Structures are given as C-alpha cells and as structure tokens.
Amino acid sequence: MDLAVLAWFGATNHPWVWAELSRSMPSSETPLSNGGMTTLVALTILLASYALAPFPYWPSFFRLLWFMLTEPMPLGAKVQQLGFLLVESISVPLRTLLWYLDELLFPGYRQIPIEPVFIIGEPRCGSTLLHRTLAKSEEDFFAVRHLEWRFPFLTIQLPIAWLGLRQFLGGISYWPDSDVGKLAARMHPNRLDDWEEDGIFFEESFCHHFFIFLRFPYPKLLKVVDRFASLPEAVQRMMLDRHHKAIQKVAYLKKNQPRYYLSKEVTSHDKIPLLLELYPNARFIVLIRESKDFMSSLMALMEASTSAKNAGYDPRSNADWLPEVQTRMQQDCANLVGLCKDVLPAEQQLGLYSPDLFRDIPATVERIYGWLGLEFKDRLREELIEQSKQQQIRDKGYTNQTTVFPGFEDYDQLVSSFAAAAKP
C-alpha cells in the first residue's frame, strides 16, 4: 500500500481529526438536512415528473418554441403562442401525476376492448355532422368530448361527473369571444362538451398535429409538426398507445358500454396504416366531396381559426402560407386515394358522398347501420328525419367563395366514384 495512503489513514484515526471533520459536516441542526434536503427532494420529484411525463412530445414542443422565437410574426400573435407553450410546460408535473394516479387507482380501465369506427376523408365534408349525429346514438356508439380529449384523466373526469360540473364546463366555447372567434364558432361550433375529433388529443397533448399549425402558422413549420409517419416508429406507437388509453378511460365511464368507438380523424391520414395494424378489425367511413367545395370551405375556416388563435393575425399576409397549405392538402388527398385503393380492405371501408348526407341524413345513417350490422330503430329514424329538416333550413351565418384549386384530379375521380356508387 502507498506510504502516503498509510500516513493519511493513520492521521485520520487520531481523535482530533475526526472532531475537526465532524464540525465541518452538516448535522441534523443544519439547514441542508431541513430546508435544503426538502428542496433537494422537491427538485428531484419535479425533474422526475418531466422525465416521466406522458406529454408533450418534447421535440415538437421545442420546434414550436424555436419558430416562435426566430420567425417573424406580430407581437400579439407571439404572446398568444408563448401563453400556450407556458401552460403546456408548467402543467407537465400535474398531468404526469394525474396520468400515473389513473394507472394506480383505476387499473381496470386497461382491460376494456376498443372496436373503432374511424370517420376519415377530408375536412369540411360533413364529418362533424356525421360524427355528432352518430354519437347521439349512445346505445350503439361512444365518442370522446372535447373536455375528455383535453383532460384524459379519470382522476379529473370522475370528480367532474360526481359534482355535476360537466354541463357547466361543457358550455364553455373553445373559441375566443371576438369577432373572428364568433365567425370560427359559426363555421365549426366547438364547446367543451361537444364530441370532437381525435386531433384535439394529438394537438393538445403532443403538440404534433395539423391543428397545431393553426396556433403556430409558420409555413416552414407545417411539415415538421404535421407528418405523423415521419416520426420514429417507437414514438408513433407511444402516441397511439396513449391515444388508446385515453379512449379506454372514456369507455370506463360508460355504464352500458356501446359496441363501437366512434372516431373522427380527417386531417392525419398518414397514421391510418398503423391504426389498421393496431385495430385489424377497424371500420373506416370515408366521407368526401369535390375538392373545390371542401378546399374553399377549409381555407375560410383555417383563416378564421388561425386569426382567432393569434390575436387577429391574417395568415395570408405571409405569401408562403397558402401555397404551403395547398401543397399539404394535395398530398393528403393523394394519400387518401392510395389508402382507399391499396391499403384499406374493401369490406372494411364504406365510401360516402357528402351531398347525400346533407340531403338525406336518415338514409345515410341507415346505410351505415346496415353496413355495421346494427339495428336501425324507428325511433332513431324519426329523430333523424326531424334533424334532416332542421339541417335544410338552418342559417349557417357565413358564406364561402368557391375557388377551384388544381392538383386534386385523382381525388376528384374518387369522389365521382363514390357519388356514382350511391345512386340506386
């Protein structure tokens, strides 16, 4: 053994050495073992809550932050964007706690099977009308409400139900109380109690979805936070696993569990192949109409929604915004055509032409019920006849200017085939 080590060892065995060392070390009376240790433990727990957080998807979160900090945009819009990111980041510890409390307190929810019916197609083709119409038949379907997508925690949803708060909270509009917010609300009514599409979950929880582009309308950002299939496969599966659990939690709250989970996801078709792998018996309702009609309506809604979420900012003031969105929608439509022709089994997809739904809701729903093997009851028919009458006379409260967009020829051929197939 080294002589220096022996000398040190011998020296430290002298009583006076230990006395000096003990005086310099913290005792039970020092702040480190009280306030200091408490702070250390609290910091460790805080860091663990971020490390184990189920949400958000941090790479997308930091890309949003980077674009907000580096790309030009009016100050008011950036303030709203920063507010969203602050809420998203500050709420992580609480959301982590609630997520794992669900796992601890309600493990039975994971045993509930999910048999989905996915409404896909393109936005502004009547998918909200169809989704909410079918969701009202709670004996046959269950859907997820906006409030449930935003707070996918049984430890939140159960107290809301017990205290009777859902009606109060559900009456809150998603849209701001501004002129452009009211316009967006007329185009797409959205209260927290409304049945809403799955994209709300991916936007609010993971910061990775087409919808997040409406909050952060930087043209170069769209490809980054929109494409699901470009994510690592492990990340894709993680997102869909948590999406599956969020659906199971809603099913857990149902006393009489309906047969089908009713999904609406009309803006993220590149996740469909993996969904088909995870749910091999899933059914797909493909609802579409001509590109000139859905694109004209979509552009108007996107402008209103983006402006409402960004302090009145007009996205068309950026010359790159419209071409980027148009290219994205062309690619999405091409993807949809490929899915219908080459990916989705013929017996698992039902093509619907939107004008048929608008003209005759009962006939369209009866066709869906027959395809799914569900009983179409007389009471439901009568309710739908009345709904269809109201649909014909309702005042939308807005008008869209029709514009023809090039690059949708293959998609429009698919629309024509759906329209022809529906004719007697």
Per-range role (PLM):
Residues 1, 5-95, 225-240, 251, ...:
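PAPS-dependent sulfotransferases, especially Golgi type II membrane carbohydrate sulfotransferases
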Residues 265, 275-300:
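Conserved phosphate-donor/acceptor-positioning beta-strand/loop module used by diverse small-molecule
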Residues 93, 97-119, 149-152:
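N-terminal signal-anchor transmembrane helix
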Residues 137-147:
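Post-Walker A helix-loop "phosphate-sensing" segment adjacent to the P-loop in P-loop NTPases
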Residues 252, 257-281:
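Flexible, glycine/threonine-enriched loop-and-boundary segments that flank and lead into catalytic domains
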Residues 119-138:
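Glycine-rich phosphate-binding P-loop
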Residues 149-261:
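PAPS-dependent sulfation machinery
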Residues 120-122, 262-266, 288, 354:
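Short His-Asn-centered micro-motif
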